[in-house]
Every structure is written in C-alpha cells, then in structure tokens.
A protein has these predicted regions:
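Alpha-helical substrate-recognition element adjacent to the catalytic core
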Residues: 2-161, 166-175
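C-terminal cap/substrate-recognition subdomain and adjoining C-terminal extension
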Residues: 119-144, 148-298
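Universal eukaryotic N-terminal targeting presequences
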Residues: 1-2, 298
C-alpha cells in the first residue's frame, strides 16, 4: 500500500520566469534570419510590428478606466488584463501574417534554443536545473504555461538547461504552423492573456490529476508578469512572483491589489500565505514551503 503523501504540482511561466529575460525579440530575430536565407528580408517588417504593438498598448494602458493607480482589487486588475485580449490577439495575427516564422521546423527551433543558451543570448534563472532535479526526486509534477510564440523553442531551452528531467514535460504554449500562422496549445486559439493562461493551467492540472489517485498536496504557480495574475491569485494556488530584486511591475501590481507577497525564505512554521516572491529557483529549493532540499515541508 502506497502511503506516500500526494505530490506537489508546480506550474511555471517561461519568459522572465524560467529565463532571466523575455525571449520574444531573440525568437523574432531567429525568424528574420531564417527568412533571410530564403531571400525574404523581414527585419523592417518586424520593427513596424513591434512599434505598432507598443503604440497600441500605450493607448490602451493610458485610456483604460479605472487607471492603474485606482485598481485596488484582484477583480479590477483581472478585468483590465482581460480587456487587453483584442490588442494582444491583433498583434499575434499581424505576426502570423508577416510570415516571420514560416517553414521553421521543430528541430530547428530546438537547435536554436540550445545554441542561444550556449552563446548567452538566453539565460535561465539560477538554480533552474537543480529545481527540476529536486522536483523529480520529490516525485512532484511540473509543467509550463506560456504565451511565447514557440512551444518547441521552450522545449529546446528546457532540454538544454535541465536535461532528461525536462523531456516529457507538458508545455502549453503557442506555436507556428508550416505557413507561420500562430496557433495555441493543441492547435487551438492563440493563448495571449491572463484568462487563457488560467484555463491552460487548469487543463494541465486536470491532465496530471487524472493520472494520480491522490490529487495534489499543493498547487504552486510561478510567474513574473501581468499575464500571470489570474494563475498567481487563483483559489487554492500558492503563487510565487519571480523578481530579481523584489521590485518590478508584477510586484507593484500585487502590492497595490493586496496582499503583498512575502519572500519564500522568510516563511515560518505556523504562519501561512498564498502569495510569495523569489529571486530565482535556488531560493525556491531552499524554502521550507516545499521540502525540495530534503527538509520537512510546511
């Protein structure tokens, strides 16, 4: 009879969470380079796309009511994040129409990811490889939910930075088809906003739960941006905001809507919270919250 406790489920964002910085520009320049070998120079087209998005986002941000400083609850912030859907989907559609990712195969994406890590164009946060090892050792489960353009690029980064422990991991993210059109997880609608990430997290957890007789002892979500707000604050979820210095846009949002996140290393037995922050995965491993360093989970 198996008397082991139910596993912990970790769900991770990718850009700025697993990686130190956003990788969208790195991916875009890879697409530009691939198309250039076929005689198509899309560099200027990409910068137009980039500028168009920036202008649209600025108009939406400054025109939305209630203004940022006046949004004081999770519900108000979630409503704002969901209001960005048409803007984000419009941007994804323009990327699809540009053909920047046309005819880039899965193997090319993975090789590029490996090369980008080796060159230092992409860097993962401190302790990520050890985090994967400890999660697997603890028989916990983990997966990735991301609005990134390429799930295969994510898989390449995971394989190159965490080895065999990451090869069979569920990655729910967008991906381009052969014509360069961006599709969402399982070839569904593009995933671009916080509500879509929440739905993806629930889908991932349901798949994992169906293979477990005991369910999960804890569900932990780790993210770094506004698109993570619904996952971080979902009922029954322990949220960890990733921040290099305990500052930044997401931390500001969480402080504004409350409760403010506490550092994962400051947790003491008998005191509980559902919202934390960490600088990197090394701090998450050492935290007494999850027992990943061989200590007792609290």
């Amino acid at each position: 009879m198996d008397t082991s406790p139910p596993p912990i489920a970790f769900v991770l964002d990718f850009d700025g969470t697993i990686t130190q910085e956003d990788t969208i520009s790195t991916i875009a320049h890879f697409g530009i380079a691939c198309q250039k070998t076929r005689g198509n120079d899309l560099e200027n087209a990409w910068y137009i796309l980039y500028d168009t998005y920036g202008e649209s986002f600025s108009r939406s941000f400054h025109g939305y009511k209630p203004a940022e400083a006046d949004r004081k609850t999770v519900a108000e912030e979630v409503t704002y994040q969901r209001a960005l859907k048409s803007l984000e989907l419009g941007s994804f559609n323009r990327v699809s129409q540009s053909g920047i990712f046309k005819e880039i195969g899965d193997d090319q994406w993975r090789k590029f990811a490996k090369d980008a890590l080796e060159k230092g164009d992409v860097n993962v946060r401190k302790g990520f490889g050890d985090f994967v090892k400890q999660v697997n050792k603890a028989k916990a489960t983990w997966g990735v939910v991301s609005v990134n353009f390429s799930s295969q690029f994510i898989r390449g980064v995971l394989a190159a930075s965490a080895g065999a422990g990451a090869t069979e991991i569920e990655v729910l993210a967008n991906h381009p088809d052969e014509e360069g059109k961006l599709l969402g997880p399982n070839d569904g609608p593009v995933m671009a906003t916080s509500d879509a990430k929440l739905a993806a997290m629930k889908d991932l957890l349901q798949k994992r739960k169906s293979g477990s007789k005991t369910g999960f002892s804890k569900v932990v979500y780790i993210g770094d941006s506004g698109t993570d707000i619904e996952c971080l604050t979902a009922e029954g979820v322990i949220g960890i905001a990733m921040s290099t210095d305990g500052k930044g846009r997401l931390i500001d949002i969480l402080n504004r809507i409350g409760p403010s996140p506490v550092h994962v290393g400051s947790q003491q037995e008998g005191k509980s919270s559902s919202l934390y922050w960490a600088r990197n995965f090394e701090e998450i491993i050492k935290s007494p919250l999850f027992g990943l360093e061989g200590g007792r989970e609290i």
